[in-house]
């Protein structure tokens, strides 16, 4: 049985912080894939593992940093060396000093490597120390350190080592979904367009991302709608642009996923 120890968690407005230690036997994990509407910055303190983000696989080890964009499916696929320890920071774009900054950073590269004596390393451990305390200035302090962490990464060259891409057909499927998201209503829409069998498309998704095709498509539509709502689009205009056949079905799907209504998303 996996020995998972959550040693520290902390949440402030617009940001979450966690420090976890795992000590399982090396091998293929049973970790569930997941997706969320915010950025995630993951820093590996110890261990070696293979981590999947959409169509890419990353070999991560001590000192590596991975930046995951909102709406990207990801999970730890295989552990090569234990114990495995990592920091995770989740943050909304509007939480940091410049919401375009994280976007530009993740477009420049997803994987970075930092030295143990780097400013980034000192900052991440200062977050850990801050998470152990309760003050009336938590939000301001966390925001300041988060901004500094992103600036450190901006000044760090991306690390292209240890990155591989998935099956070429899987890449074609993801590209097709991205470009035709609003028009896809069933697996056959994808299979026919790419001259692939329905069963093969379904198999690729299960083996590569551990998720069903239409679950992936539906959640991508919801994420797109969320992004549009945050930019000021009206819920009654968003649903059709994101491929939902009617507003009630969009409302139910969105509310079930986020726990609040599309209208409430515009106000938060």
Please tell me what each predicted stretch does:
Residues 1-25, 66-136, 150-157:
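A hydrophobic/aromatic-rich effector-binding and dimerization subdomain
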Residues 1-59, 80, 248-249:
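Generic protein-terminus/edge-of-domain signal
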Residues 2-3, 241, 252-268:
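…primarily DNA-binding HTH/wHTH and HhH modules…
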Residues 55-70:
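Short acidic-glycine-tyrosine-enriched beta hairpin
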Residues 63, 200-205, 249-254:
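Short hydrophobic/aromatic patch on the recognition helix
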Residues 106-118, 131-144, 150-197, 207-219:
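Short, Lys/Arg-enriched, Trp-marked, Pro/Gly-tolerant hinge/linker segments that flank
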Residues 175, 179, 188, 207-246, ...:
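Terminal helix-turn-helix DNA-binding modules in bacterial transcription factors
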């Amino acid at each position: 049985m996996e020995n998972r120890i959550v040693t520290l968690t902390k949440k402030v407005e617009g940001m979450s912080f966690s420090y976890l230690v795992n000590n399982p036997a090396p091998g293929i994990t049973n970790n569930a894939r997941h997706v969320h509407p915010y950025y995630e910055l993951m820093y590996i303190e110890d261990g070696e593992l293979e981590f999947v983000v959409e169509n890419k696989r990353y070999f991560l080890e001590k000192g590596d940093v991975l930046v995951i964009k909102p709406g990207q499916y990801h999970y730890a696929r295989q552990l090569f060396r234990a114990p495995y320890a990592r920091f995770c920071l989740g943050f909304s774009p509007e939480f940091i000093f410049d919401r375009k900054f994280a976007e530009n950073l993740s477009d420049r590269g997803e994987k970075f490597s930092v030295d143990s004596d780097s400013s980034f390393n000192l900052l991440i451990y200062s977050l850990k120390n801050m998470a152990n305390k309760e003050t009336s200035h938590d939000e301001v302090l966390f925001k300041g350190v988060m901004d500094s962490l992103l600036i450190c990464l901006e000044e760090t060259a991306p690390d292209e080592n240890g990155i591989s891409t998935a099956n070429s057909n899987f890449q074609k499927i993801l590209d097709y979904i991205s470009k035709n998201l609003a028009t896809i209503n069933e697996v056959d829409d994808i299979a026919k367009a790419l001259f692939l069998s329905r069963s093969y498309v379904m198999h690729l998704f299960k083996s590569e991302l551990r998720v069903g095709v239409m679950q992936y498509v539906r959640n991508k539509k919801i994420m797109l709608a969320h992004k549009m709502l945050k930019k000021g689009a009206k819920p009654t205009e968003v649903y059709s642009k994101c491929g939902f056949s009617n507003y009630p079905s969009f409302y139910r799907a969105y509310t079930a996923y986020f726990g609040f209504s599309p209208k409430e998303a515009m106000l938060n």
